[in-house]
Amino acid sequence: MKNDSLKGQHRINEQIRAKEVRIVGDDVESAVYPIAQALKMAEDHEADLVEISPNAVPPVCRIIDYSKFLYQLKKRQKEQKAKQVKVNVKEIRFGPQTDDHDYNFKLKHAIGFLQDGDKVKAYVFFKGRSILFKEQGEVLLLRFANDLEEYAKVEQMPLLEGKRMTISLAPKKAGSPKKAETDTAKKENPKKAVETKE
């Protein structure tokens, strides 16, 4: 794994300018040492003296192989990035008098977006006097939300902003198929579902 992007961000060994440093870590006693002694300790450990907190007084260092240090840092950054879930918002535009063919086409796209984990913002755009059909636009968006009930939850009900009426939908967290099948069985035949469970 390449760590080139992280190199040069830390002073190591003779690059450290402080006269004394605080060393932390598992294999050494945490204390303040003169820089010459700290460098000797790093050499004895066949490792590097890495400055990890340059603004502290005195600067904080670790005795560790610099390549290993960069690897750990890169790994930690990658884990943090993985935790940050990026949510995309897909927009779907309707006219106030959208026909069924166009509606179903856009509904299919919305289902795909939601299944991919994206949010959907659907809106009706009113041109000129078509603003007179705003109630029709609201009905259309509510129908859209109702048809997507299996895949999405409503984050924002239809809201008119200028010439656009918008509704916001977020994907539902999918439950396990096994649980869904069990729930269906209970609804269809409660007694049989109980017997199966036993």
Swiss-Prot record:
The gene is infC. PANTHER family: TRANSLATION INITIATION FACTOR IF-3 (PTHR10938), TRANSLATION INITIATION FACTOR IF-3, MITOCHONDRIAL (PTHR10938:SF0). SUPFAM superfamilies: Translation initiation factor IF3, C-terminal domain (SSF55200), Translation initiation factor IF3, N-terminal domain (SSF54364). One of its GO terms (molecular function) is translation initiation factor activity. This is Translation initiation factor IF-3. Its main location: cytoplasm. It is found in: Cytoplasm. It comes from Phocaeicola vulgatus (strain ATCC 8482 / DSM 1447 / JCM 5826 / CCUG 4940 / NBRC 14291 / NCTC 11154) (Bacteroides vulgatus). It holds the Pfam family IF3_C. Residues 168-198 are annotated as: Disordered.
